[in-house]
Amino acid sequence: MQYSGVDSETYAREALPRFKPKRGKAETWVKLAKEAGCVYTILTSRHHEGFNMFDSKFSDFNVKTTKGVDIVKEYAEACKKYGMKAGYYFSLLDWSHPDYDPTGSGISYPKGNYEAQKQGRRQFGNHEKYKDYLYNIFNELLTSYAPVDLVWWDFSQPGFQGDKAWNATALMKNLFEKNPKAIQNNRLYHSANHLSEGGIRVTPAWKGDYSTAEHHIPATGINGDWEACQTLNGTWGYSADNQEWKTSQALIRELIDTVSRGGNFLLNIGPMPDGSIPPESIRIFKEIGFWMKKNGEAIYGTRANPLNIELTWGRLTRKGEDITYIFVYDKPDNGELTIPCSFEGDVKAVLLGGEKTVNMSQDKTSNTPPFYIINMKMETAATGINVMGKRMIHKRSA
């Protein structure tokens, strides 16, 4: 809608007849996510155009128009069936609501709506009333589709955030009263949004549980808990015109990069108008799932790279005090992986997915740090190695 240049009414008139979700599709989404190794999922409950993907008594612009298919209800039931945490993307914006007023906020608003306002076909209403509406539909989501385990708010700007724009305190209070174990990102406030390739400002914890990086992975991670979200091609929603699919190998590297820098990885799928997942998306998710079955222990429950440097040939993650995982992207020509650290106690290295031990030795040359050197025959890219040894110690040369 933002790119089409039309107003909300024209967009709804053109788009809704094409939106024909079939029953049972939400379960296929959750099942595929489970097979790919995901432990939580996030469904777009509503986006900026204001269409609610659940039945609401506060708005007629919702799934009542889709022949009775309550997508959020099916999704919530599927999450329970497959043991997945149920998260929801929830747009704070609503381009269709008559009381939503973004004037002077710096937040994106369709050009078509501004044109309609100039022509007298559309007027901005009372934004205080809109905040009441926002609270009411969010409360519907919390009460009718419980449990809501995660909320992915979107989004704010410097002059339009928090209580002023969204009555954020009341929204957060309602979430935690309904589910004290729920978590949320911090996009109810502006500083939660990514600023550039160079980094992200982190808001205080009371403004959200984690930060979000959109379409990039910060080179040094982000202080505190964070998540990187990425697409399979160049779009978030389904686009028949965009067939520039990323390879599963490239996305696995992005997953590893994210985890090795202390973050979670959220990978987006844009279903087709009937709810079917594009074949290429299915293929990519299944390939990632195959890799995760072999290497998942180096992803789940791990911490960021314990060294203060990033290796040129791969990445590291750490679990507890005894295990370091090594991901090999590009094997050096001499077949040796040099790690500038030492381990306390006995050390052993094995390939993940088996018990095959790889040779590991320590370079004790006096004029260098105590490097550990692993000699191995790399079978595939992003091969995982489990190094079992007590506390890793990074040494700097003088």
What role is predicted for each listed range?
Residues M1-A398:
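Mature catalytic domains of secreted/periplasmic carbohydrate-active enzymes
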